[in-house]
Amino acid sequence: VWVGVIPNETLLGLSKFNRLVQWIGARPQIQEETVEQIADEIPVAFIENYDMHTGLMMTSGVDVWLNNPIRPMEASGTSGMKAAMNGVPNCSILDGWWPEACIHGVNGWAIGNAEDDRDDDRDAENIYKVLENDVLPLWEEDGDGWSNMMKASIAASA
């Protein structure tokens, strides 16, 4: 799921978004038929017109808040904070608020190290490692552990 606002519809923001769309096999213009064409191959959803209501629904209605900002570009991470307040564990690159709040494996998960410089390939590898080795086993095999993680997420946001 790709959610966000292209800041002031800047050319740079549009360029990056268009590159993402091209990367997933669609053309630069997001159209319904384009999404349908790639849906069988790559499950992608783009939520347009992201606003406070949409943010509220997402931060209170997901099982894990996966956040992978480019270090050090995360201003604060308020959506992750809101998710934690709703008992949603964060799984995030250590940027914004998360380096101060994260206790890996207790209230969420860290992706990589805070000291790391930008390395998209390494970050992608670390995302999959954390999801496969930490997040999914807890979710699938330890309901009590998951509940404790949710409670610790709420406590971290207090």
Residues covered by each model-derived region:
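Nucleotide-activated donor-binding/catalytic signature segment of Leloir-type glycosyltransferases, i.e.
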Residues: 2-54
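Residue-level preference for alpha-helix termini and adjacent loops
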Residues: 5, 49, 97, 157-158
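Polar helix-capping/helix-linker motif
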Residues: 27, 35, 141-142, 158
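Catalytic binding pocket for nucleotide-activated donors in carbohydrate/polymer assembly enzymes
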Residues: 57-157
